[in-house]
A protein has these predicted regions:
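Generic beta-strand or strand-like secondary-structure segments
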Residues: 76, 80, 100-104, 124
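Phosphate-rich cofactor/ligand-interacting catalytic cores and adjacent structured alpha/beta frameworks
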Residues: 1-68, 106-229, 246-257
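Amphipathic alpha-helical interaction segments
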Residues: 81-88, 92, 105-112
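Conserved phosphate/anionic-ligand binding catalytic regions in large, soluble enzymes, centered on
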Residues: 86-100, 229-244
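Alpha-helical scaffolds flanking conserved acidic
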Residues: 72-76, 92, 119-123
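Short, hydrophobic/aliphatic alpha-helical segments
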Residues: 68-86, 226-229
Length: 257
């Protein structure tokens, strides 16, 4: 198995598939999408950004350990995501969640030669964050600021300029883990510092409901978790990660009969 190609495939698929499910409370992107959330924006962003995750897997393999920096590739993924489209930072949250997850996955592949143990991958992510560096903190800040820039441009195009408060991390924290402790109110940060509890629940639900189909199952878990999570866009990002985990667990299974 070429883990780099598997990562590329699954990152592409999970981001392209997630918006195909019908989710009440979230724009039906195929029918009544707002100017910033057209279905094609999500598909294009997912395809464009996936190659950075191929590079991330390749970097971990080449180093034989966790590299000195991984979040620069989150920045590269977000920068690439806008090629050929308008819209805002439509897959920002997915990139943020997938970066430490893919790193953990490839590290486990180096150690065990397999990627089928999803629970081990999820459990490894806090350790990945603890082993990040000041270079990661700098890159994470650039990634966050780029997301703010993309959002601001979209608001300007829509005639609704919106002032944004940009967090500043560089020079204040020695690792992404350390920085995360001051931002646990952010859904994605709480998720990846705690081993992805919501993504795990979504993954398990999808896994146990494969007979009804991945997309119908994703619609059901969305309805179930939305009152608890409270934000439709955040939950959509988590569902994308859940899809990624099922694709990782079942690389050869027919999941879309």
């Amino acid at each position: 198995m070429d883990i780099r190609r598997e990562v590329l495939r699954n990152v592409t698929l999970c981001q392209a598939l997630e918006p195909l499910g019908q989710k009440p409370g979230l724009t039906s992107r195929a029918e009544d999408a707002s100017p910033g959330t057209k279905l094609e924006y999500f598909v294009i962003a997912g395809v464009n950004s996936a190659w950075a995750f191929y590079d991330l897997a390749d970097r971990v393999l080449a180093a034989g350990r966790q590299p000195d920096c991984i979040f620069d590739l989150a920045y590269e993924a977000q920068a690439a995501s806008v090629r050929g489209r308008l819209g805002g930072k439509v897959n920002y949250g997915q990139i943020n969640l997938l970066t430490p997850l893919v790193t953990a996955q490839v590290l486990i592949f180096l150690e065990a030669g397999t990627t089928s143990d999803v629970e081990a991958i999820l459990a490894r992510t806090p350790e990945v964050l603890r082993h990040t560096t000041e270079r990661d903190v700098e890159s994470l800040e650039r990634f966050i600021h780029l997301g703010y820039d993309l959002s601001a441009r979209q608001h300007e195009r829509m005639g609704r300029p919106k002032p944004l408060q940009r967090p500043h991390l560089q020079g204040r924290y020695a690792s992404v883990w350390e920085a995360a402790q001051d931002f646990l109110h952010v859904h994605a940060v709480a998720e990846y510092t705690q081993g992805y509890p919501y993504c795990r629940r979504i993954y398990r639900f999808l896994l146990h409901n494969l007979e009804i189909g991945m997309l119908p199952a994703s619609e059901l878990i969305y309805r179930f978790l939305l009152p608890e999570v409270g934000r439709a866009d955040v939950l959509a990002d988590m569902i994308s990660v859940g899809l990624y985990l099922v694709l990782t667990r079942h690389p050869e299974t027919v999941l879309f009969p």
